[in-house]
Structures are given as structure tokens and as C-alpha cells.
Amino acid sequence: MRIYPTFFNIFFKGMDPEKAHHIGFWGVQTLRNVGITRALRKYFQPAPELATTVMGITFPSPFGLAAGFDKGGKGIAALAGIGFGHVEIGTITGQAQPGNPQPRLFRLVEDKAVINRMGFNNDGAAAAGPRVAAARADLETEYRGVVRPIIGVNIGKTKVVELENAIEDYLISTRTLTPQADYLVVNVSSPNTPGLRTLQAIESLRPLLTAVREEANRVSPNRHVPLTVKIAPDLVDEDIIEVAALAKELKLDGIIATNTTIAREGLGLTSDMTKVKEIGAGGLSGAPLKPRSLEVLRLLKREIGDDLAIISVGGVTTAEDVQERLDAGADLVQGYTAFLYEGPLWAAHINRGLVKLRRARR
């Protein structure tokens, strides 16, 4: 019996989604602070057989938490403690910023989806750096002798920075956060920062990724920090192929696909479309994104083969969804939106489901 969906319907369904998010995040942190997740580590920790090596890093599970839940690195160890094989924080920007005006987070409960126009609200790279360093030290101590959860850091452009100065803004985050990160993500695909998606164009993306790679190498000379780029599902296939070719050319370590979509039509939404239109602009995530996310994954696998890692995200809810992505060529899989609907046992359930699926194939 799954208790959390009932709990969600009673306590969270009628609550402002952003307030519910903060309460839920506080709850996960409290589970760690009072020692519950550590006491139940045997339950939450992924089975050893799920460990996988990607981009030269061993992950305890192929399933992790996508960027967006922990925007500032405040709950990395707590989230790692409930079963995620990796926790990707952010998006972090060079400067602290409040994000877009509220309300900016909306649920489409019937579709198990969310629309957000958060706008990279975060405390900035300078504040996030020490948090990541502390979390990394905690995890290295707590998981000594076993595969520890991995920390990804997702960086983006500060809203007030003009596009012509975007590279330097990304470099502020790069030099501050690379030494603490296990891997780095260049986010050029959020629809909620004006002009950001134009950086996905090859003529803009090439110098940006080149500069970030060089700076990451400079500030971390003794440890290779894998570099990935996160792309939008709204790119046409030809553009995705171009990005894949560029990633191979620049010897990136991976591609994360996909971010949220600005589309509303063709997603099979069952929610009241009048309500959807009233919500307005923002990126849609969750179950309706699954078909396009799978399409992009298969296209990327065809184009890059095993040359780069592919991290698939978008519409992932169940262990079967995760295994489907792995079977389609993903090296790692991420989720976020379903976490809001499924609750704190979600990652543990997925890891247990993956073990059952794999054992059934033997």
C-alpha cells in the first residue's frame, strides 16, 4: 500500500505548490537531522548490484535527482540519504538572484505534471560552494567503504547579465564550484531566463563550453571533473544532432536530455486547458514529457553511441521507466517531478524495483 499519495491529497494538494515544496524539503532534511535516514540506511541505500561507472565515476545507482529540487545545495546529504544515486543541485548562477515573481510553480495533478517559471532563484555560486564542499566531506565520511552518492552541480546564467557577457558569468560559477563538484552541468535550456535558450545555437554554445572546460581544468588540475550540457526537448532533431556533434568534437563527457518543455499541445494533457492557459508561461515537466524525452534519448544514442554519457530525464516515474531509459541507451536516469507526487520513499522504491526487474531477466 502506498501511503504518500493519500498524504499528498490530504495535506499538499490544496496548498500553494512552492510552499509545499519548502515543507517537503524541510521534511527530508529533518529525517536526516534526527537520525532517521541514517538509522534506516539499509532500507534506503541502493543494492550493491546497482552500482555503475559513468564518466569515470562510480554511482551507487543509475537513478538520481535532477536539478531543480535543491537549488542551492542546502540538502545534498539528506537527499542522498533517501536513495538517490546522485543529487544534482542548482541551477546555480554567478550572482545570487530572487528568481521570477510568485506564483511561479503550478501543478497539473491529473497529468502528474508541473509548470514552473522559477527563474533560477538561488543564493549564487559563492554561497553554494561551501555547502557543496561540506556535503561532499560528509558523504565521504558517512559512506566510507561503500560507493557514496555523487554530487552534480548545474550552472546557468544570471538574469541581469547580458548575453554577450554570459561566458564570464558561467565562469564565475565554474571556478567557484568545480573543485567541489563530482560533475558539472552547463544549463542552456531553461525557458525561464530570457534569451538563455539562444545559447544552444552552435555558434554560441561552442565558445561557452570551450571556456567552461578550460576553466574547470585550470581550477581542478589534479582531478578531471566531467562536463555535461543540458538541452531542451523543444530543439528540432537537426539541432540535437548538431549539439551531439559539437559535444563529441569538444570531448565533453556527457549530454543531459531533456529540460522542461514550453509546448502545451501534442502532450496528451488531460488537465483543463483553460487552466493550463491561465497559468501561462513556464516549463512543463512530468509524465507528459516522457514520449519526447525518449525520442531525444534514442536520437542521441544513434548519434554519439558510446562516445559520451547520456543522462536521460523527463517523464520518469517508475522503475520500469528507468529501466526503459537504460535499455534505450541512457547511462544514467534522473527524475524530479514525480518526487513531488510520490514522496520521500520514491528513490528507494525505484532502486528496489530495478533490482527486481534485473533479477527477473536472469
Predicted segments, located by residue:
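Glycine-rich phosphate-binding active-site loops on the catalytic face of alpha/beta enzymes
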Residues: G83-Q97, V188, G254-R264, G315-V316, ...
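C-terminal helical cap(s) of enzyme catalytic domains, especially alpha/beta-barrels
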Residues: A96-K112, E265-G280, A338-R362
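A gly/proline- and charged-residue-enriched helix-loop-helix capping module
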Residues: G90-V147
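Catalytic cores of alpha/beta
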Residues: G72-G81, L235-E249, R302-D306, V316-V333
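An N-cap/entry alpha-helix motif that binds or orients negatively charged groups
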Residues: R2-T52, N116
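Glycine/Thr-rich beta-alpha phosphate-binding loop at enzyme active sites
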Residues: I36-Q45, P191-S204, K248-D306
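Active-site glycine- and acidic-residue-rich loops that bind
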Residues: T158-Y170, T198-Q200, S204, T228-E249
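Short beta-strand/loop segments at the ligand-binding rim of alpha/beta enzyme cores
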Residues: G56-G64, V146-V153, R218-L235, R302-S312
